[in-house]
Amino acid sequence: MVSHTHKRRKRASATQLYQTCKAAGTCPSDVINKVEHTTIADQILKWASMGVYFGGLGIGTGSGTGGRTGYVPLTTGRTGIVPKVTAEPGVVSRPPIVVESVAPTDPSIVSLIEESSIIQSGAPITNIPSHGGFEVTSSGSEVPAILDVSPSTSVHITTSTHLNPAFTDPTIVQPTPPVEAGGRIIISHSTVTADSAEQIPMDTFVIHSDPTTSTPIPGTAPRPRLGLYSKALQQVEIVDPTFLSSPQRLITYDNPVFEDPNATLTFEQPTVHEAPDSRFMDIVTLHRPALTSRRGIVRFSRVGARGTMYTRSGIRIGGRVHFFTDISSIPTEESIELQPLGRSQSFPTVSDTSDLYDIYADENLLNNDISFTDTHVSLQNSTKVVNTAVPLATVPDIYAQTGPDISFPTIPIHIPYIPVSPSISPQSVSIHGTDFYLHPSLWHLGKRRKRFSYFFTDNYVAA
C-alpha cells in the first residue's frame, strides 16, 4: 500500500483576504477593521494617546526597538530545554522577515489593489504650550543639559472636509482632529451630511374591541364562593324572626345604638351574663347577611365569630358559626294546559248543512218585468243613541261638622265713597307746522348707496 501525504496549505492572512475581496465588496467586517485599524482596541489607543504621553518608551511607535532590552528570539526545537539568552546592551535584534512562498496553484495575475495602500491624509498638529519647558537632570557629574524651549505662537487650525457622496475611497483614513498639548480639542465639521433615512409618517393604532360573535352576550363576572358549608363552620339554624331585623337583641341585653342590620356587628366587650339566646353565647363579631338558595329554599345567613378564650397577649381563640334561617320555599313551576282558541262549548257544531237551505235555479231569480217609472231614490240614515250606565263609586256616610269655635276679633273698616274727578282739565292738542316723514320706499336713492332717512323739523309742535 502506498500512502499519499497531502501537504497542508497555509491559510490566507487578513491582508491577502482584504486585497482580493475589497474590490468585490465581500470582505467580512472583522477583516476590514483589522486592516484599516478601526477595531475597538485601535480606537481606544487612538483616543488615549491624545491625553497620555509615554515619552520614549517605544510603546505603539512602530520603531521595532523592543524597549530597552530588545527582542528575545523564540526557541525552535524540543520543548523543555530553555536556551540561555544573554542580553547585550546596545545590540538590538530585529524580528526575521517572513518570506511567503508561492504555490503553483496561486494566480499569476497580481492584483493592483496592493499598490494602493492606506493613505494618511495628514497628521494632527500639536501646539506647544506657552508655559516653560521641561528641565532634565542627569545623575552624572557632568553639567546637566537644560532644554530651553521657547514658546511659539499659538495657531488655531480648523479642518473642513468636502466629501463627494457619489464616490468615497474606503482606503483613505480620515485624520484625527488636531489636539493641543494643553488638552484642548479642536472640533472640525463636515459640509456633507449622511443620507437621511426615509421619513415614514406614524399612524396611531386604535384598538377596537369589536364583538367576536354575531350575537354577543355580555359576560358576567363569577360570584365569589361564600363557603358557608365548610367543615370549619358550625351550622346553627335560627327560627326566631328577630334574627332577620335585629340580631343584636339575641346577643346582649343592652340597648345598643341604632346600627344598620345589613352591616357587620362587632361587640367589643361581651357581657359575662348569659345571652338571651344560648346559641349566641360568646359571639363577638356577626358579619353582614347574605341571601342564598339551597335545595329549593331562600336562606338568610350570617357568619359569627366566638371569643371563647383570650390570652394575655390579647389573642382571641374561638370558632366560627354559620347562623341561617330559611325564609321561604321556591315552588315548582305549574304547568298550565292551553285550550284551543276560536271554539266555544256553548254553541253546537254544524257538520251537515245540506238540509238547511233551499236551492233555486238562476232563471227563477231573474225578473225582467220590473218597471221603475215614476220612482225616485231616497237614502235614509238613522242614528240610534244608546245610553251607557256607569256605576258611581259609593261614598261612605261621613258626618260633616264645623271645626272648633274660634272667634278672632275683627274691626270693621269704613271707607267713604268719594267719586274720582280729574284734577286737571283736559287740554286740546293743536299741531302747527309742516313737519312730515318720507315714505320708506323713497329712502333708497340708488342700488349701492348707503341707506339713510330724511327728516325735516323746521317748525315746532305746540301742546
From Swiss-Prot:
Keywords: Capsid protein, Cytoplasmic inwards viral transport, Disulfide bond, DNA-binding, Host endosome, Host Golgi apparatus, Host nucleus, Host-virus interaction, Late protein, Microtubular inwards viral transport, Phosphoprotein, Viral penetration into host nucleus, Virion, Virus entry into host cell. A motif (Nuclear localization signal) lies at residues 1-12, 444-452. Disulfide bonds join 21-27. One of its GO terms (molecular function) is structural molecule activity. Highly phosphorylated. GO terms for biological process: microtubule-dependent intracellular transport of viral material towards nucleus; symbiont entry into host cell; viral penetration into host nucleus. GO terms for cellular component: host cell; host cell endosome; host cell Golgi apparatus; host cell nucleus; viral capsid. Minor protein of the capsid that localizes along the inner surface of the virion, within the central cavities beneath the L1 pentamers. Plays a role in capsid stabilization through interaction with the major capsid protein L1. Once the virion enters the host cell, L2 escorts the genomic DNA into the nucleus by promoting escape from the endosomal compartments and traffic through the host Golgi network. Interacts with major capsid protein L1. Interacts with E2; this interaction inhibits E2 transcriptional activity but not the DNA replication function E2. Interacts with host GADD45GIP1. Interacts with host HSPA8; this interaction is required for L2 nuclear translocation. Interacts with host importins KPNB2 and KPNB3. Forms a complex with importin alpha2-beta1 heterodimers via interaction with the importin alpha2 adapter. Interacts with host DYNLT1; this interaction is essential for virus intracellular transport during entry. This is Minor capsid protein L2.
